[in-house]
């Protein structure tokens, strides 16, 4: 519903969306070029096939009652109880997969950023937790690729200041409004 209100048209063909298995444990992995909109688009595409999905997302995004049931909070490393919260996240994720559900995640755990001032945005290495889920869950894995990257201003702001970068987050969401997007869904 939010995608429709934002005017974001998903141009992924039906035959690619059909690659999402309708039943059984599933992990959907994707690059993360844009931020919040990536997760919203993935949720919309998966929801066209099945509604038993949960998205691993930063804990600050989980306090919205309308979407909270679809979220599993990922703690920030600097949080006082990050280790305990991380274990809870892992347990909740594995329980959901054992129950035959879908987990949507961004393996790098953060939005793609440029390594230098002017280079292209690149994904960070997958975090250890992602490797463990993929290996130990026995779930089917479906890869998704989003083309594009955030604005150069955002990528430069990331080099200068966390506050400046965070201040531009809404601008980056606004750049996605009323535009088509064409994620590519790979074979399981």
Where are these regions (language model features)?
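Membrane-anchoring hydrophobic helices of lipid-metabolizing enzymes
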Residues: 1-29, 39-41, 48-52, 68-69, ...
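Short, flexible loop segments at the rims of nucleotide/cofactor-binding pockets, characterized by
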Residues: 3-8, 32, 79-84, 119-120
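Hydrophobic beta-strand scaffold residues
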Residues: 10, 53-55, 103, 141
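Generic beta-sheet signal
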Residues: 24-30, 101-107, 139
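Short, basic, glycine/proline-bearing loop/turn elements
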Residues: 29-31, 71-80, 114-117
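Gly/Ser/Thr-rich loops at beta-strand to alpha-helix junctions
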Residues: 32-36, 111-112
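Conserved nucleotide-cofactor-binding alpha/beta core module
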Residues: 47, 53-86, 90-93, 97
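A cross-family acyltransferase "interaction/gating" segment
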Residues: 102, 110-188
């Amino acid at each position: 519903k939010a995608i429709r209100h934002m005017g974001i048209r998903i141009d992924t063909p039906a035959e690619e969306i059909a690659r999402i298995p309708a039943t059984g444990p599933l992990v959907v992995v994707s690059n993360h070029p844009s931020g919040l909109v990536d997760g919203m688009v993935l949720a919309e595409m998966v929801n066209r096939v099945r509604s038993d999905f949960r998205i691993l997302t930063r804990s600050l995004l989980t306090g919205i009652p309308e979407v909270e049931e679809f979220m599993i909070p990922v703690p920030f490393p600097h949080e006082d109880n990050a280790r305990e919260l991380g274990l809870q996240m892992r347990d909740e994720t594995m329980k959901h997969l054992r129950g035959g559900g879908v987990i949507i995640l961004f393996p790098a755990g953060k939005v793609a950023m440029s390594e230098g001032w002017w280079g292209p945005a690149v994904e960070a290495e997958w975090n250890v937790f992602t490797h463990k889920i993929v290996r130990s869950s026995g779930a089917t894995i479906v890869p998704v690729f989003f083309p594009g990257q955030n604005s150069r201003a955002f990528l430069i702001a990331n080099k200068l200041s966390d506050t400046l970068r965070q201040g531009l987050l809404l601008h980056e969401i606004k750049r996605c409004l009323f535009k088509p997007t064409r994620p590519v869904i790979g074979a399981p």
